[in-house]
Amino acid sequence: MDLMMPNDSMFLFIESREHPMHVGGLSLFEPPQGAGPEFVREFTERLVANDEFQPMFRKHPATIGGGIARVAWAYDDDIDIDYHVRRSALPSPGRVRDLLELTSRLHTSLLDRHRPLWELHVVEGLNDGRFAMYTKMHHALIDGVSAMKLAQRTLSADPDDAEVRAIWNLPPRPRTRPPSDGSSLLDALFKMAGSVVGLAPSTLKLARAALLEQQLTLPFAAPHSMFNVKVGGARRCAAQSWSLDRIKSVKQAAGVTVNDAVLAMCAGALRYYLIERNALPDRPLIAMVPVSLRSKEDADAGGNLVGSVLCNLATHVDDPAQRIQTISASMDGNKKVLSELPQLQVLALSALNMAPLTLAGVPGFLSAVPPPFNIVISNVPGPVDPLYYGTARLDGSYPLSNIPDGQALNITLVNNAGNLDFGLVGCRRSVPHLQRLLAHLESSLKDLEQAVGI
């Protein structure tokens, strides 16, 4: 039995029926040419034949001290693989829409805390011959990006590699840490203390830049929207892929970044959706965007320099060309100021953006206080080249996040071998007809292509 880290325990304490705290992913695979009707069954049999489990896939919350829960891990020595790995088939006609409906139900249900906190579902029956895998793991075990990287380690660049690796028995990667001594620890403590002391001046600097340059977006400048409400327990998931070349063409013609073009594509789709619902705010929606703050000169320096910025999505603007330039200016202004700050201050300011969401459950808070932002839009790096799983080609990889109170819609996308794979998760009650956003994303991209002369 091991004690939990406080941040791991937090995800278990805040979880409820309305707020599942697992992360998920939906992957689509195309069997190799000539594969027979038994391919998926045989694939699943080879998958579950991996009968050794790394510690992370054996642990579940334990109760200690006569009733204290959610502070320690217990480890199962006898894993019921048939419970954790399940094979399902879609009803006829086996549309992608049917797969997404099943995925929505799977993403809604809580993981059983009496068992290790993960599930994997193999789904066949798609009318185009592909099959799917939906995986979910509790956030107390692993974060979404790490889970995606773990899943990618089961894949191979060799289309003839027939081995079916399992995420639960991959050998841990060796960790290399620099030697630690008392002086380095003291240096770290002084660095953190200096960052805390400097936080207030840094915040003033951000405010001054916003006022003088009118480029930055500060927390609580977001309007109230239909997305910033309490969420129910039911989820709806939507997923679709777009060619990265189309987005790159918009990027080049508009003179912006790929991420700017993606944000503009999302902004146009959100504008279409909100107009359709007669719910478009007069002021622009604000997105929280995780970004790399590393300069081009430091691109190969190693380490992590990641924070979050707030982006003006210009959803009140009708012209797509003007909208994408507004988004680009907003992102450039935010990243420029944040890149001048020490890393710990960047992380602290990013945490301040998220802090109000911890109060979202307080009665009346969401209606009384402007939201810090309206939506999270994340663009996650993924594989550049085609990958295969037991000779089946990875055709789509769709990340599915969780949504807290006050954030009823999440958009996460990943780069996958020349495509951008979008995964959308929404509160089933608060964001009706979520799949309409997929059509609006396509319409928005076409608008951008036309606006920049493609």
Swiss-Prot record:
Main enzyme class: transferase
Induction (UniProt): A possible member of the dormancy regulon. Slightly induced in response to reduced oxygen tension (hypoxia) and by low levels of nitric oxide (NO). It is hoped that this regulon will give insight into the latent, or dormant phase of infection.
EC number: 2.3.1.20, 2.3.1.75
InterPro entries xrefs: Acyl_transf_WS/DGAT (IPR014292), O-acyltransferase_WSD1-like (IPR045034), O-acyltransferase_WSD1_C (IPR009721), O-acyltransferase_WSD1_N (IPR004255)
Gene: tgs2
PANTHER family linked: O-ACYLTRANSFERASE (WSD1-LIKE) FAMILY PROTEIN (PTHR31650), WAX ESTER SYNTHASE_DIACYLGLYCEROL ACYLTRANSFERASE 4-RELATED (PTHR31650:SF1)
Catalytic activity: an acyl-CoA + a 1,2-diacyl-sn-glycerol = a triacyl-sn-glycerol + CoA; a long chain fatty alcohol + a fatty acyl-CoA = a wax ester + CoA; di-(9Z)-octadecenoylglycerol + (9Z)-octadecenoyl-CoA = 1,2,3-tri-(9Z-octadecenoyl)-glycerol + CoA; hexadecan-1-ol + hexadecanoyl-CoA = hexadecanyl hexadecanoate + CoA
UniProt keywords, alphabetically: Acyltransferase, Glycerol metabolism, Lipid biosynthesis, Lipid metabolism, Transferase
Active site annotation, chain numbering: H139 (proton acceptor)
Family the UniProt entry places it in: Belongs to the long-chain O-acyltransferase family.
Function of the molecule: Catalyzes the terminal and only committed step in triacylglycerol synthesis by using diacylglycerol and fatty acyl CoA as substrates. Required for storage lipid synthesis. Upon expression in E.coli functions as a triacylglycerol synthase, making triacylglycerol (TG) from diolein and long-chain fatty acyl-CoA. Also functions as a wax synthase, incorporating palmityl alcohol into wax esters in the presence of palmitoyl-CoA.
Pathway the protein takes part in: Glycerolipid metabolism; triacylglycerol biosynthesis
Protein name (database record): Probable diacyglycerol O-acyltransferase tgs2
pH dependence as annotated: Optimum pH is 6.5-7.2.
UniProt keyword Acyltransferase, yes or no: yes
Pfam families recorded: WS_DGAT_C, WS_DGAT_cat
Annotated organism of origin: Mycobacterium tuberculosis (strain ATCC 25618 / H37Rv)
Molecular function in Gene Ontology: diacylglycerol O-acyltransferase activity; long-chain-alcohol O-fatty-acyltransferase activity; O-acyltransferase activity
GO term, biological process aspect, one: glycerolipid biosynthetic process
Annotated transmembrane regions: none
One Gene Ontology term, aspect cellular component: plasma membrane
